[in-house]
Amino acid sequence: MADWETRAVRSDGCRIAYDCRQGEGPEVVLLHGYGLDRTMWAPQLVALEGWTVLNLDIRGHGDSRPCADFSIPQAAEDLRAVLVKERCRAPVLVGLSMGGYVVQEYAWQFGGCAGYLVAGATPILLDCYSGWERAGLRASTPLLGVWPWRCLKSAMAMACSSTAVSYTHL
């Protein structure tokens, strides 16, 4: 069983932290959802035993700080910095929710991956929202800004979790 090593790369003023485990096959690169960090992938890491895995904290999440600004294109640049540092030739990118947006943006900007998997609540980055949906998203930004993070995280956990274990570890 290979050991995990925590590594980091600097990208546009932010330290991008990730765990790396050497193994076989193409690199599997995991990108978490909004408000989470790389620890969300713990159950999947068991199934990936023996594979080479890079498990990132996306900019502004977990140990990837400081983060003055965030954008999906910048997160894709951060991902590229990690892949260049690790000399990944044909990684398989796995993104959940916001991580799926980053995977799509990376594919759009850079391409060159063996495969992509975008899972869970990640529409393609095209003009897929109606005018009402776009207005609702714009209105939600200031509302979320006044909601205490602790309460927002708890509400997200309740909405997304189906077991006590998943709720308490979110």
Describe the predicted segments one by one.
Residues A42-P43, L54-V94, M98:
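Active-site loop/oxyanion-hole signature of alpha/beta-hydrolase fold enzymes
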Residues C14-R65:
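Conserved HGGG/HGGXW glycine-rich cap/lid loop of the alpha/beta-hydrolase fold
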Residues T168-H169:
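Conserved small/polar residues in nucleotide/adenosyl-binding loops
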Residues A2-R15:
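N-terminal cap/lid segment of alpha/beta-hydrolase-fold proteins
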Residues G100-G111:
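Short glycine-enriched nucleophile-adjacent loop
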Residues E27, T52, A90-V92, A114-G115:
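Structural signature of beta-strand start/N-cap positions in the alpha/beta core
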Residues A139, W147-P148, L152-A155:
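Ligand-binding pocket scaffold of soluble enzyme catalytic domains
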Residues W108, Y116-G145:
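Flexible "cap/lid" loop of the alpha/beta hydrolase fold
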